[in-house]
């Protein structure tokens, strides 16, 4: 036993190899074993003392989730093993911002200021775990973290930060994350002002009835203009910016004020009074050793280790092996109550069992309600929807021997990404591969890059396409996700394509260029709003097929990089669409087929043939390239053959000798043309992307 010189002196001793804490009392000589921990700092940060006064201390130390039992009413704090659980001291919030406005940096400063993460463990973009996220400077997979903060009123508050992806491709995931919160920090760059994604995130926050706290970030930049940007926010969004927080996530300016605003303005979560357990899933990922890890927000009731839970959308049931909180590393606890954010795992092998937006309930409570004849036994939380792919493309391995490797790699990515869909596809020109569905172009690029980087697979990627609807006479409508599957339409048949509503924020001097671009892409101008005398927003409705190619590149080019855009799917509309086929050496090339509007078919066919002529290498025989609608050729080009001078060895003599050599060469080229194969490079398949230039 370790003796102390001072009477009644209590000390913590951490045994690093066993991660066990001993509480030694020198007067009584007894020890108490504490729960496993990663060190004294970790245990102190996970202990949460709640009392009516900041000077009161519980007699026994532990975490907030020290025991089980049914939760009392929200007005009566619940004591568990000497710990007071008080939902009124919980604040669930998210950070929303346009790309590169400082969202991840602000999250780093909040974790650092509250000492949630030790200074030696801090690194830039702490919540961004993937290398791709750090390289691109974007958030792809959302994260969550619990922060303990002692406010200026002396009370200790539990702040649950739920980080969100910032790109429009992941808007559904963002909406489910915001549904798990009561408040949101709206971060706006003080030098750039409001951008398109800023407005999109604000709309999502308003739909979920969140308290929005505006923050001007990067005020330390020489180009910062806080007064102008604050006026933009008031004029555009309608938020009161009289007391807006001026902050710099890089230098730490204003971080304490932000924490105080969270405590004062974000309402506490509504706590249920004895209802059944319900929780909202806002993210999940696959771990090779533990299976699927589910991140959720408890809406009603409580869940403990050992409970059996049911996922309502998939009807899957699993035993809970572990529940815990994120700080931001995962820390196991005994129980999670209404209003808290945490994780669970329990030998779940398929991420489809725990989809984003689904509702978790206790299997026992579900069966009890079902036995009483309730329908449904437990009401699901609103807002769940299956992820619907918006963009499709073909992925083919360069080496045919890597087909199995590609299938295994897609299966592993699918475990972490429920929005990714794929099915086998074969092509005479490309061999065997997969037809993959994605939420958008960024999602597609990320999956391709991960396949090449993490699994070392060289890919041939076909041009992306959207999903079309076809209504044939006397038949039910059906979907087309591959241009080669588009049928020839009769007089009474109808083809429909997806339309999006797009908002473009731009300096007003570029309004004309953007309107011209919208008209070129078959768009309908809906509205023009002037946010300030120098900035405006232009609203268009246009086909998604015109957006997924090079629209964003053209927008940046015509506005010198100043414009930003955001779009959302609205509906399907009838269009005069045709399938444009490409024949190379009189053979159909299905990967190069595309669906276009009839009015643009001839011009697009000419540009496509011209592009392929430049990209396909010359052969020893002539290669014709044809663009066709049905059996009608609307454009054509030909690649001239490389010429071999068979007369070089003839130095005069009879002309018949030369004719014989030329006839022999022509005969050989004719045979070569009939059996020869044309190698089409990867760049040729992406030529479809540049047809609108």
Curated annotation (Swiss-Prot):
Family: Belongs to the TRAFAC class translation factor GTPase superfamily. Classic translation factor GTPase family. LepA subfamily.
Chief location of this protein within or outside the cell: mitochondrion
Stored InterPro entries: EF-4, EFG_III/V, EFG_V-like, EFTu-like_2, G_TR_CS, LepA_C_sf, LepA_CTD, LepA_IV
Taxonomic source organism: Phaeodactylum tricornutum (strain CCAP 1055/1)
Domain of life: Eukaryota
PROSITE patterns given in the database record: G_TR_1 (PS00301), G_TR_2 (PS51722)
Keywords for the protein's UniProt record, in alphabetical order: GTP-binding, Hydrolase, Membrane, Mitochondrion, Mitochondrion inner membrane, Nucleotide-binding, Protein biosynthesis
SUPFAM superfamilies: EF-G C-terminal domain-like (SSF54980), P-loop containing nucleoside triphosphate hydrolases (SSF52540), Translation proteins (SSF50447)
Membrane topology, as annotated: Peripheral membrane protein
EC numbers, comma separated: 3.6.5.-
Polar residues: bias regions: 51-63
Annotated PANTHER family: TRANSLATION FACTOR GUF1 HOMOLOG, CHLOROPLASTIC (PTHR43512:SF4), TRANSLATION FACTOR GUF1-RELATED (PTHR43512)
Compartments, record wording: Mitochondrion inner membrane
One Gene Ontology CC term in the entry: mitochondrial matrix
Region (Disordered): 51-78
Record: residues binding GTP: 97-104, 163-167, 217-220
GO molecular function, one term: GTPase activity
Its job: Promotes mitochondrial protein synthesis. May act as a fidelity factor of the translation reaction, by catalyzing a one-codon backward translocation of tRNAs on improperly translocated ribosomes. Binds to mitochondrial ribosomes in a GTP-dependent manner.
Occurrences of domain tr-type G (ranges): 88-270
Protein name in UniProt: Translation factor GUF1 homolog, mitochondrial
